[in-house]
Regions:
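Helix-start/capping segments and mature chain N-termini
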Residues: 2-186
Length: 186
């Protein structure tokens, strides 16, 4: 038994800057009754083609929808996803096909500790896109072990790009990022 530790740079080449995410309704990452809740090779292998297509189109990652109705948001390839909707931090509830990330849990617990409204629930892609249009969705960000906090500047769905937070990092994502990296660096 041994442990290897190694300092690394930012997970994304652009560092802590908003990423571009493509929503996939063509492919799925995990299915009901499967092992989407665990880090297994099969979950990653199933996502390779969609991620390749996203990168060829200039997107950083893929946002996965549920495998049955293909309308409920699940997670991004390398991180869980959060939305700031009407000043409430919302993330998809764990359904067995979403990885219960430790950074996800940290965001939920910190948000509650700070007195922010935090909710886990089912969120449709249409709710998010309509919220981006009418301003009720003010931020989108991911949370993961490697990425820590990653602001989303663009969501693409069915060939249409939707800008988030004017393409800038929002204050909620920034607060979580600064706090979590502050813990890491001391």
């Amino acid at each position: 038994f041994f442990i290897i530790l190694s300092p690394v740079g930012p997970y994304y080449s652009q560092g802590f800057n908003p990423v571009k995410i493509m929503v996939s309704d063509k492919y799925v990452r995990a299915v009901p009754g499967g092992v989407g809740f665990a880090k297994t090779g099969g979950n990653y292998a199933a996502s390779n083609l969609a991620e390749k297509e996203a990168k060829e189109l200039g997107y950083t990652q893929v946002l996965w929808l549920d495998a049955v109705e293909r309308c409920y948001i699940e997670e991004v390839g390398a991180m869980n996803i959060f939305f700031v909707i009407n000043d409430e931090i919302v993330t998809p509830q764990l359904t067995g096909s979403i990885l219960p990330g430790i950074t996800r849990m940290s965001v939920l617990e910190l948000g509650k500790y700070w007195g922010l409204k935090v909710k886990e629930g089912r969120i449709t892609i249409d709710e998010v896109l309509n919220g981006l249009k009418d301003g009720t969705v003010s931020e989108v960000f991911g949370a993961g072990t490697a990425a820590v906090i990653s602001p989303v500047g663009t969501l693409s769905y069915k060939g249409e790009d939707y800008q988030v937070s004017d393409g800038e990092t929002g204050p909620v994502a920034m607060r979580f990022y600064e706090h979590l990296t502050g813990i890491q660096y001391g």
